[in-house]
Amino acid sequence: MVSRQEQFEQVQAVKKSINTASEEVKNQALLAMADHLVAATEEILAANALDMAAAKGKISDVMLDRLYLDADRIEAMARGIREVVALPDPIGEVLETSQLENGLVITKKRVAMGVIGIIYESRPNVTSDAAALTLKSGNAVVLRSGKDAYQTTHAIVTALKKGLETTTIHPNVIQLVEDTSRESSYAMMKAKGYLDLLIPRGGAGLINAVVENAIVPVIETGTGIVHVYVDKDADEDKALSIINNAKTSRPSVCNAMEVLLVHENKAASILPRLDQMLVAERKEAGLEPIQFRLDSKASQFVSGQAAETQDFDTEFLDYVLAVKVVSSLEEAVAHIESHSTHHSDAIVTENAEAAAYFTDQVDSAAVYVNASTRFTDGGQFGLGCEMGISTQKLHARGPMGLKELTSYKYVVAGDGQIRE
């Protein structure tokens, strides 16, 4: 096993091969990575079967689905890499140019970060997405996968590096930390001078540990306690469609709804319909029904478990939904501000003033009017695959695409000027 220190030194030694690579060279590398990923389908699926067998009974079915790969999912990962090829290269973009009175010409130019570290949990597609985005944005990458997905991740990284071996980009610009212990995560948090940026992708425990302990600069990809508020002026059919999509289309992802807020004027009519749609109809269709966590007012209209205080602060990532009835738009916004992780929140209303108030007052990375929160995604936003959803305000916010993985520098051109 190569030590972490050796890996940090290896990636530092070769980072210039990607930091200064042309767009053509980077695109050739990405295409080779995609081709070799598909070519290694058999090996990747064999590794994934080992991870699935080891994880069964230890993690939820929803989380097992995150971990699971088949040939179609691997092809989708390769397709995601190829989509990055089609995106404009951000490196070298001139952001601003100005000329001073003394004749100096100052150009603000986009540049690579250098080496980016990614700590993430059991999602194999993050491996290929992260590699594609970092390389296209001119960065080398150090990956640290969760132990539940390690065999799969190792097989994916092996395929990606074999692709790079056919190009002029050194394969060591992609590094996979072989040690999946907690100590390896902490080593990355302290790797100042080796990592220029650290991005955690996972649950609240992982993200909080990185934010609290890292001395390397961090972009926080926060958890998603996502709200949908059904206003008194909502179209109920529209609201039910949005709720169904936001909760059930893929409950294990960070942009899935976790909390439903309903105006008291709508509760008596919409909550029984919601119960029919999310419980009775799903049972009839052989699907897992939604389990409700209800406040005292909501429990008057629908059956379910009484909500505990912590239910409104929980990212369930499962077929569980906390429901609260509120007396006003202002109460809904106040609840969101008290419990939100500032990821994605939505209002369903036909009232333009209510929509404007909600979008002005709710301080989240993405705020929706009459649309599902499931759109908070790099691909859906036209950014290609994403590095994560930033819930902080410094440097990057919302879906992080190529530009969010870059910095800038000033190039100052003169003709012998000196400062008096």
Curated annotation (Swiss-Prot):
Pathway: Amino-acid biosynthesis; L-proline biosynthesis; L-glutamate 5-semialdehyde from L-glutamate: step 2/2. It is an enzyme of class 1 (oxidoreductase). Pfam families: Aldedh. It catalyses: L-glutamate 5-semialdehyde + phosphate + NADP(+) = L-glutamyl 5-phosphate + NADPH + H(+). Gene3D superfamilies: Aldehyde Dehydrogenase, Chain A, domain 1, Aldehyde Dehydrogenase, Chain A, domain 2. It comes from the Bacteria. Belongs to the gamma-glutamyl phosphate reductase family. Catalyzes the NADPH-dependent reduction of L-glutamate 5-phosphate into L-glutamate 5-semialdehyde and phosphate. The product spontaneously undergoes cyclization to form 1-pyrroline-5-carboxylate. This is Gamma-glutamyl phosphate reductase.
